[in-house]
């Protein structure tokens, strides 16, 4: 038993290392985008395909992961995924042009898309329900810490070295994980010779790819853009057809019957809400720090580092607490903290102290470390073992979709409210108002005197300055409004978390009832006595 536990822990470390690399890789490029635009001489729209392409491949593969795990087994799939990811990373590092870089990213995405649900499914096999929180807490360490530390690491590399170092550094670690996995990874279940549901696969690929692409473009192009509308509609129709087809199938590729289990359904909804709130912070804070306040990428990343370290420490602890107290106490406390700290971000100004933001972000990370993995585990614990791979595929698919929709929604709110606030400020600068014009003329004259320039030059300077300040302040207010929406989503999650329960107690209750029934005398014996 001791040797088995030791072997499981060694396997868990290997799995986490592979998963950490894959998730870290998703956020490393964000800071490097301007450098890559210069390096490859491409536009911002073109370079964005490094992120969009990765997301689309991930989103298409995750729903197929349940079939892949059952068909090829965990060991072969893990080694293949890591091999593809490492090869793609090397191609990115040595790429002489954008086309090669994009090819490397797509190969990376194939490996990364397989790894997330595979690692989660393996953990569910390694840990029984009564100690599963510990395993999922360690899983959450990679899921939460990697994207949080990514901006800091990439910012440091970009400021001190070439962007290629970000990829070269991952290759040897990937090779080590492959070698260790080859010797230590054993299949939890034997592969089954099942056939690929071709119709389901086509509907899945078309539906999820179209929806994710449409939603990702909506943030920049708007929801009324013809391409956005058409791809979202195609995606929704494709996914609806996929669901109907899978429910009729005797051997579904992705079994939607997992939603018959109430705690799995509830935990999926809560996690989708939390994902929106998480992505809001990851998207809005860098915009505020870099675009508005003027911090460097490294300074922005360093601000998020304490929060990342909090998640590093708290994720395993939250898993242990889950095994002892269940999901509801953790979810309620975590969401209360998340609601309060997210609301605090609705009061940002240009002059908000740096350390105040560091503190609030770290406390917010503390709250979130109690949420995603414990709540996900609460739902997964209700599923029978044969549905584990389908449950993990479904959870990761919903996470991918909610993350994309959340980012797009937050972007739309931010841009729309920024436009609204700028228009409101423009209305207040009424040139027909004598008081306003008197103040403006006085400012122009004092500027001309202090800077020793003509009145015409001073007027141009003052107007330009006031316009810039209006744009700056309207952007900050737009960010505040977007955080208000994120806080509202968290409140909904908090209310829903009150209905969470520990399904392990359900199972224990049924077991005790069954034992009581076996101890009762037979009806005839009871009558005679």
Where are these regions (language model features)?
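Membrane-embedded alpha-helical segments of multi-pass transporters/permeases
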Residues: 90-94, 178-183, 240-244, 343-346, ...
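Symmetry-related core transmembrane helices of the 12-TM Major Facilitator Superfamily/SLC fold
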Residues: 167-182, 231-235, 483-498
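Small-residue-rich alpha-helical segments with characteristic i,i+4
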Residues: 136-138, 143-149, 155, 357-441
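Helix-loop-helix hairpins in multi-pass membrane proteins, especially solute transporters
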Residues: 55, 62-200, 226
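Helix-loop junctions on the cytosolic side of multi-pass membrane transporters
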Residues: 179-198, 244-253, 420, 499-509
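Hydrophobic transmembrane architecture of multi-pass small-molecule transporters
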Residues: 401-502, 507-529
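Residue-level hotspots within transmembrane alpha-helices of multi-pass secondary transporters
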Residues: 31, 63-64, 118, 148, ...
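Transmembrane core module of solute transporters
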Residues: 7-70, 99-102, 107, 140-142, ...
């Amino acid at each position: 038993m001791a040797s088995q536990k030791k072997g499981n822990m060694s396997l868990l470390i290997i799995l986490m290392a592979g998963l950490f690399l894959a998730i870290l890789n998703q956020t490393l490029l964000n800071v490097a985008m301007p450098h890559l635009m210069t390096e490859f001489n491409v536009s911002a729209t073109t370079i964005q395909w490094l992120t969009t392409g990765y997301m689309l491949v991930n989103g298409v593969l995750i729903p197929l992961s349940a079939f892949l795990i059952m068909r090829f087994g965990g060991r072969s799939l893990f080694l293949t995924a890591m091999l593809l990811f490492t090869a793609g990373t090397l191609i990115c590092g040595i790429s002489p042009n954008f086309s090669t870089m994009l090819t490397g990213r797509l190969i990376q995405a194939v490996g990364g898309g397989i790894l997330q649900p595979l690692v989660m499914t393996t953990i569910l096999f390694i840990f029984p329900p009564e100690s599963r929180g510990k395993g999922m807490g360690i899983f959450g360490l990679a899921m939460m810490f990697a994207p949080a530390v990514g901006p800091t690491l990439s910012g440091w590399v970009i400021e001190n070295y070439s962007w290629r170092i970000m990829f070269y550094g991952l290759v040897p670690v990937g090779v080590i994980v492959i070698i260790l996995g080859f010797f230590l990874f054993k299949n939890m279940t034997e592969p089954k010779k099942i056939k690929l549901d071709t119709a389901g696969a086509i509907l899945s690929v078309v539906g999820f790819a179209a929806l994710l692409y449409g939603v990702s473009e909506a943030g920049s192009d708007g929801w009324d853009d013809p391409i956005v509308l058409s791809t979202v509609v195609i995606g929704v129709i494709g996914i609806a057809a996929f669901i109907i087809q899978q429910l009729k199938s005797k051997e579904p590729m992705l079994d939607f019957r997992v939603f018959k289990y109430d705690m799995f359904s509830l935990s999926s909804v809560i996690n989708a809400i939390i994902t929106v709130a998480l992505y809001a912070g990851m998207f809005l804070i860098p915009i505020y720090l870099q675009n508005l306040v003027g911090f460097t990428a490294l300074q922005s990343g360093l601000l998020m580092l304490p929060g990342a370290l909090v998640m590093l420490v708290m994720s395993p602890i939250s898993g242990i607490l889950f095994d002892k107290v269940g999901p509801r106490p953790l979810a309620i406390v975590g969401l209360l903290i998340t609601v309060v700290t997210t609301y605090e971000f609705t009061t940002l100004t240009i002059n908000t102290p740096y350390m105040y933001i560091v503190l609030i972000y770290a406390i917010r990370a503390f709250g979130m470390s109690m949420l995603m993995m414990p709540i996900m585990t609460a739902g997964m614990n209700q599923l029978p073992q044969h549905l584990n791979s389908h449950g993990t595929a479904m959870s990761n698919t919903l996470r991918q979709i909610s993350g994309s929709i959340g980012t797009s929604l937050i972007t739309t709110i931010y841009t729309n409210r920024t436009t609204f606030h700028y228009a409101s400020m423009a209305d207040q600068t009424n040139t027909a108002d004598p008081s306003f014009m008197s103040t403006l003329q006085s400012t122009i004259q004092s500027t001309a005197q202090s800077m020793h320039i003509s009145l015409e030059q001073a007027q141009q300077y003052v107007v330009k300055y006031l316009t810039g300040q209006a744009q700056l302040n309207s952007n900050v207010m737009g960010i505040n409004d977007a955080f208000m929406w994120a806080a509202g989503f968290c409140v909904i999650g908090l209310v829903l978390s009150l209905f969470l329960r520990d399904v392990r107690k359900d199972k224990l209750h049924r077991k005790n009832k069954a034992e009581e029934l076996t101890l009762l005398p037979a009806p005839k014996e009871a009558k005679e006595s």
